[in-house]
Structures are given as structure tokens and as C-alpha cells.
């Protein structure tokens, strides 16, 4: 019994020290650099890069899809903008005919209909193969982007060393439930602490799919690796965003974060789909962490600490909780030290974030701690034990919608509706 108590106390104490050091460094590096005033940059004389926006869609709600496409159509980008909407074998194509018909009037929009569901990765590649812009922006079909997102991301890509950039994620349905409010805060932390700190060193480890821009010249050399990703000899069909970002870093490109390029995405409003999403992300993170390990030698010491420390920290936290619970069950003795450390660290973290963001709502992020301890940590352990499972988990969750007619062939339409292809896509 003494061993259990000692293990729990030691693990949580080491975890507290590690996390304090990590969070302090993260907050320091996430702060904007205040440099001396510089002269205004000369007016850009080079032609603006052409931007291709790719929107993969599968069984998307017509209203959500329409909002996504409207936000893209309203971009203020003065350069050439083309939009490729890929319907990845959706079963509700008849339900979104009006959406496709409306946007097919805009000559910037093209629609690609795939005859069967092949996954987001192959849907992206289908559009990349039919487009030719200098920059490629992926936008998820359940997301809406602010009017200046393309301009701000493209501006960051003026540096030829930058291969990929991402914007700041928010939850478009943050007001729906307590969980969506929590996820919105989770996104803010992931972007404005983790990604912002990584961006200081030009190595954002995951440019998130709802709003990620890539340099085509960099992307072209990586497509084969991206399309044929294997894990333990089996195709890996999820975690596209993280994997493509790691490939960019391996190829020697910088990946950065643009905090004022705002994208709002629909997030799960109940625990079941949220935990499915977390399981999928955990598997992807573990897989690509192994892939990223050789990169750490050439990156900043902070990034090595970031990659390794996060995983070790979670292991220490899990060890402390498990041994503490075992000690409680076997001796009826409450592990007060473990509880005190976790409670204090939670309160301090939420208070610091509330001050940093200047938003009192982050005090409510204390609710994330029990979810993390009793749901997400066990889920991550399960993910680690089932890394070979490539089930998308959410791909077949949409209701079955009958589609009339025979099997379709992939068709691209541009600017108008044609009877053969139901004309628009996504």
C-alpha cells in the first residue's frame, strides 16, 4: 500500500514540475515578438499568387455547406481565386442540388463528384490534380472563414521558406451546449498557446484541416507520400492534416500560425461524437509523433521538449491517477496530495489563461479536468493499444439518404449545372 501511495505522490509531483516548466516556456514563446519599429514594406510589385480553395465534403448538411461556400465567395483577396468542391461519394446529393446549382453560377467554382466514398485525403488529391494555383487552401465543408482569411494566409506565404500555414480555429456552434463552449476554449488554447509557441520556431506540428494553406511547389513533391501513408503495413486513412504537416517539415519547409486568420467550424455538441473525434486524433498524434521523432534533432530544444514532454506528462498524470485510485480502493485512504496538486494546477492554469485572453469564461475551463482525467486519458490509452485500427469512426455516422439514378462517374463541372453530374458538388 505504501508503494501505491508513494508512486502516486511522486508521479503527480514530477508531473507538476514538468508541466509548470512546459507551460511557462509555452506562454513565453507564444507571445508576439515586440521588435523595433521598421520602415514600411515596399508596395508588392510581383503578381499575387493564384489560390485554389479545396472543399472536401461527405454527407454535409446543405445549410452548413452553403454557409461554407458563401464565406469563400465573399473573400476580399484581389488575386485569382478558384474553388474546387469535392463531393466524396455523398449519399445526400439530392439534398444539396440547390446549393450546387446556386454556386455553379459563379465562374470561380468548380464541382467534382466522386462515384464512391474514398476519404478526405483522396478527395483532396482529386482536386489538387485538376487545379493549378500557386497556393492551395483546404477548408472543411463544415467551416466558415472570415472575409480576409485568404489574404492573410497568402501574405504569410510570401516567404518562400514557408510551406504551410494555418489560421485560428473557433467553434461556430459554441453557444449550443456546455461541451461546445468547452471545445471552443480548448481550440483557443491549442491555437494561441501551443501553435503560437511552435510557430515562433517555424514548426507548427499540425496545420489543422478546417483552414490550412500549402505551397503547391512544396506539396507536389509530397503527394505520393501523402496518398500512400502506411502504418504497420496498412493504409492510414485519417490524420491527414498532421501527417501532411510532418511531411512539410521533413522536406525542410517552415510551418506557421496566423492568429488573425479566423475560421469557425462545427464541433461535437455531445460527448459520444466528441470522444470518437478524440480517439481518432489520439491515434493520429501517436502515429505521427513516431514519424516526427527524427526531426527533433534539427529543431529547437523547446520543440523537442514540446513533443516528448506532452506525452511523458500524460503518462505521469495517468500513473498518478491510477495508483491513487488503487490506493483509495484498497485502503479507503483519500490521496489528498494528488487531488490538491491537480486542483491547484487547474485553478492556476485557468486563471492565467483568463488573464492572458482577458476573458473570464476561461475560469469555466476547470470542467475540462475531470473530462481529461476520467474520459480522455483512458481513451488515449486505448488509442495507443489500437494504433493499427484505421476506422474513421465518424465517416458513416450520417443518415442514409437514397440517391436516384445509376452509378455516377467522376465529373468536374464549372460555372453551370449539367444534367449528367448533378452539377455542383460538395
UniProtKB/Swiss-Prot annotation:
Its EC number is 2.4.1.-. Its main location: membrane. The keyword Thylakoid does not apply. Involved in the synthesis of Nod factor, a sulfated N-acyl-beta-1,4-tetrasaccharide of N-acetylglucosamine which initiates a series of events in the host plant species leading eventually to nodulation. Residues 401-426 are annotated as: Disordered. GO terms for biological process: extracellular matrix assembly; hyaluronan biosynthetic process. It is a peripheral membrane protein. Belongs to the NodC/HAS family. It comes from Rhizobium meliloti (strain 1021). Pfam families: Glycos_transf_2. The gene is nodC. This is N-acetylglucosaminyltransferase. Keywords: Cell membrane, Glycosyltransferase, Membrane, Nodulation, Plasmid, Transferase. It is an enzyme of class 2 (transferase). Signal peptide: none annotated. It is found in: Cell membrane. GO terms for molecular function: hyaluronan synthase activity.
Amino acid at each position: 500500500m505504501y508503494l501505491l501511495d508513494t508512486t502516486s505522490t511522486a508521479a503527480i509531483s514530477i508531473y507538476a514540475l514538468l508541466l509548470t516548466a512546459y507551460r511557462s516556456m509555452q506562454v513565453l514563446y507564444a507571445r508576439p515578438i515586440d521588435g523595433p519599429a521598421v520602415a514600411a514594406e515596399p508596395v508588392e510589385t510581383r503578381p499575387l499568387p493564384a489560390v485554389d480553395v479545396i472543399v472536401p465534403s461527405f454527407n454535409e448538411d446543405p445549410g452548413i455547406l452553403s454557409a461554407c461556400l458563401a464565406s469563400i465567395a465573399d473573400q476580399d483577396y484581389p488575386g485569382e481565386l478558384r474553388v474546387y468542391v469535392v463531393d466524396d461519394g455523398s449519399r445526400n446529393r439530392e439534398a444539396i442540388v440547390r446549393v450546387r446549382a446556386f454556386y455553379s453560377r459563379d465562374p470561380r467554382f468548380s464541382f467534382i463528384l466522386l462515384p464512391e466514398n474514398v476519404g478526405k485525403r483522396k478527395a483532396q488529391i482529386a482536386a489538387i490534380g485538376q487545379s493549378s494555383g500557386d497556393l492551395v487552401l483546404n477548408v472543411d465543408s463544415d467551416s466558415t472563414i472570415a472575409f480576409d482569411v485568404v489574404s492573410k494566409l497568402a501574405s504569410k506565404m510570401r516567404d518562400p521558406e514557408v510551406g504551410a500555414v494555418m489560421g485560428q480555429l473557433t467553434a461556430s456552434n459554441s453557444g449550443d451546449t456546455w461541451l461546445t463552449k468547452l471545445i471552443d476554449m480548448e481550440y483557443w488554447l491549442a491555437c494561441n498557446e501551443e501553435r503560437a509557441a511552435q510557430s515562433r520556431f517555424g514548426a507548427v506540428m499540425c496545420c489543422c484541416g478546417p483552414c490550412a494553406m500549402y505551397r503547391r511547389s512544396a506539396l507536389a513533391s509530397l503527394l505520393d507520400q501523402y496518398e500512400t501513408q502506411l502504418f504497420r503495413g496498412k493504409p492510414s486513412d485519417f490524420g491527414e492534416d498532421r501527417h501532411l504537416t510532418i511531411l512539410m517539415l521533413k522536406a525542410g519547409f517552415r510551418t506557421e500560425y496566423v492568429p488573425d486568420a479566423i475560421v469557425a467550424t462545427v464541433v461535437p455538441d455531445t460527448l459520444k461524437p466528441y470522444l470518437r473525434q478524440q480517439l481518432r486524433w489520439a491515434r493520429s498524434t501517436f502515429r505521427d509523433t513516431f514519424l516526427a521523432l527524427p526531426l527533433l534533432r534539427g529543431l529547437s530544444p523547446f520543440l523537442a521538449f514540446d513533443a516528448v514532454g506532452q506525452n511523458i506528462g500524460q503518462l505521469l498524470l495517468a500513473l498518478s491517477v491510477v495508483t491513487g485510485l488503487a490506493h483509495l480502493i484498497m485502503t479507503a485512504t483519500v490521496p489528498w496530495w494528488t487531488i490538491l496538486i491537480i486542483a491547484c494546477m487547474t485553478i492556476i492554469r485557468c486563471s492565467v489563461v483568463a488573464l492572458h485572453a482577458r476573458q473570464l469564461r476561461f475560469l469555466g475551463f476547470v470542467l475540462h479536468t475531470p473530462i481529461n482525467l476520467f474520459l480522455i486519458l483512458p481513451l488515449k490509452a486505448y488509442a495507443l493499444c489500437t494504433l493499427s485500427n484505421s476506422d474513421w469512426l465518424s465517416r458513416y455516422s450520417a443518415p442514409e439518404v437514397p440517391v436516384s439514378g445509376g452509378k455516377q462517374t467522376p465529373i468536374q463541372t464549372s460555372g453551370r449545372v449539367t444534367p449528367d453530374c448533378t452539377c455542383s458538388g460538395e
